[in-house]
């Protein structure tokens, strides 16, 4: 074997393999995620409205709103403009993936709660199940975007822990209100941020 050929073989062996993510354009998964988020956005108000309708007073009272109610296990979608504007793509994707992972788990919990509290409400249960599946789908799209950009995917975690159990009927109703409300808020935020990503990485 000649010296030059031996050198070429050695360089080939030492060269790191090309990342599969490097050959994937982020434009396609971003477009898919954006389309799904837009579709989800069309249904979030109906989900919240249907949910409140089945909970009884005061939640079902006209004009009910309780923005002060929050869940420590579910990150709020609101953020100061300066903080949001300073996020890079990786930071936003990480926050969004953690939020929609938490939402899928919380929506399953709310679905279980409503099966117990309102077993005769197939429309509500169907809407909750559909919202959970769409949140899972958007989470998968965001993972594909993250991979295409060569960024690490946040690890899955149990966001509910022990806090999900032992709540009263009214506490479970309020918890479901917060979850369905924040599902809408996070979907609105996803639409806005994915639109920016779509413009940035358009083919």
From Swiss-Prot:
InterPro entries: 4_helix_cytokine-like_core, PRF/CT. The keyword Glycoprotein applies. It is found in: Secreted. GO terms for biological process: cell surface receptor signaling pathway via JAK-STAT; nervous system development. It comes from the Eukaryota. GO terms for cellular component: extracellular region; extracellular space. Residues 1-21 form the signal peptide. Gene3D superfamilies: 1.20.1250.10. Keywords: Cytokine, Developmental protein, Glycoprotein, Secreted, Signal. The keyword Lipid metabolism does not apply. Glycans are attached at residue 43. GO terms for molecular function: cytokine activity. Its main location: secreted. May have an important role in neuronal precursor development and maturation. Belongs to the IL-6 superfamily. This is Cardiotrophin-2.
């Amino acid at each position: 074997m000649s010296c030059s050929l031996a050198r070429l073989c050695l360089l080939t062996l030492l060269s790191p393999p090309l990342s599969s993510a490097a050959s994937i354009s982020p434009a396609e998964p971003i477009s898919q995620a954006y389309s799904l988020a837009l579709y989800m956005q069309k249904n979030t108000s109906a989900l919240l409205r249907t949910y409140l309708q089945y909970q009884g007073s005061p939640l079902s009272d006209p004009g009910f709103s309780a923005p002060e109610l929050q869940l420590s296990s579910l990150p709020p979608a609101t953020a100061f403009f300066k903080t949001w504007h300073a996020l890079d793509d990786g930071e936003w994707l990480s926050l969004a993936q953690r939020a929609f992972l938490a939402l899928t788990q919380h929506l399953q919990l709310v679905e279980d709660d409503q099966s117990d509290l309102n077993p005769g409400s197939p429309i509500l249960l169907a809407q909750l199940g559909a919202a959970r599946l769409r949140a899972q789908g958007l989470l998968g799209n965001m993972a594909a975007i993250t991979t295409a950009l060569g960024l690490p995917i946040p690890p899955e975690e149990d966001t509910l822990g022990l806090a999900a159990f032992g709540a009263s009927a009214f506490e479970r109703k309020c918890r479901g209100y917060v979850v369905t409300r924040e599902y809408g808020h996070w979907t609105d935020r996803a639409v806005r941020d994915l639109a920016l990503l779509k413009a940035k990485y358009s083919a």
